[in-house]
Amino acid sequence: MKQDRLTLTAGFFPAVLMGLLLLLEGVQTRVELTPWALLAAAAGAYVLPTLILRLIPGSDGERCRLRFRPFKRQAVPFVLWISLAGALLAALANSGLSLLLGQSYYAESAGWQPGSIWQGIALAVLLPAVMEELFFRGAVFSALERGGTWPALLLSSAAFAMIHGDLSNLAGPLLAGMLYAYLTYTLDSVWPAIFAHLVNNSLYLFLSYAAKTYAALGVWPYMLLIALFLFCLFLALAMRSLEKLIEKGRIRRFQYRGLRQGLINGFISPGMWLLLILFLVRVLYQ
């Protein structure tokens, strides 16, 4: 089965993004960048490959859709509840993986500085939510989708997780990426994914601050128990909202066409292997 030109090309773009981000990290070690200069450089690293991928036509002349269209207002409760549940699941998954690796994920990554609150929000919350979703769900997922919906979801989510380049922060982005791709496809809009990503990053920033402030008091395990309870609550509310949307036919169903062949094409893609190599190099270097 011949692979679509756009799908094959899109497989290289996460590796291109990883290369740009590694280059930016290298520049940071040699040149002191202000937070706003870093913000602009990081935004450029995402915008450039997104625009290029958007302009590349497929074998049939069609281009990938960034899905800027608004989603149905009836889906707002579902988006809200599943975003909260997804953020908590990602936090719990990262915490569990960190325990297995003998690390304390949020305590080590807590870099909250009250004097730079707006810079922290821009760099840790707004920029990743908007730029990463436009690239991974708007461009990459849409391009890979031509080879099958499920392969596109799995491959774009795996690439999304590897871009974060940290074993302790791998499980959360993988699960979150699958949720964001699901929202993008079923609601045919990138905005629910951006909102869910904003919620996730906001929770990450809060937990980083809480870990740094209260970890010495020994309350972190109790916070995880509270997070687990809230996850179950929000998930139940989300599933109830989703059930109503399905009953009224207001949500798209996933297509299983070409699942096996799409996965084979994706996992033997040279672009995905290049990304995996860059990810392993970054992990070993760290």
Label each region the model flagged.
Residues 47-60, 95, 232-249:
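Membrane-water interface of transmembrane alpha-helices
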Residues 118-285:
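Transmembrane helix-loop-helix hairpins at the membrane interface
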Residues 20-28, 48-56, 85, 89-97, ...:
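Alpha-helical membrane-inserting segments
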Residues 1-38, 126-127, 132-135, 208-209, ...:
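Transmembrane alpha-helical insertion/packing segments
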Residues 2-16, 60-91, 250-275:
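Interfacial transmembrane-helix boundary/kink motif in multi-pass membrane proteins
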Residues 16-57, 221-229:
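Alpha-helical transmembrane segments in multi-pass membrane proteins
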Residues 27-36, 62-134, 142, 281-286:
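Juxtamembrane helix-loop-helix connectors linking adjacent transmembrane helices
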Residues 5-14, 34-42, 71-79, 116-121, ...:
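Residue-level signature of transmembrane alpha-helical entry/exit and packing/kink sites
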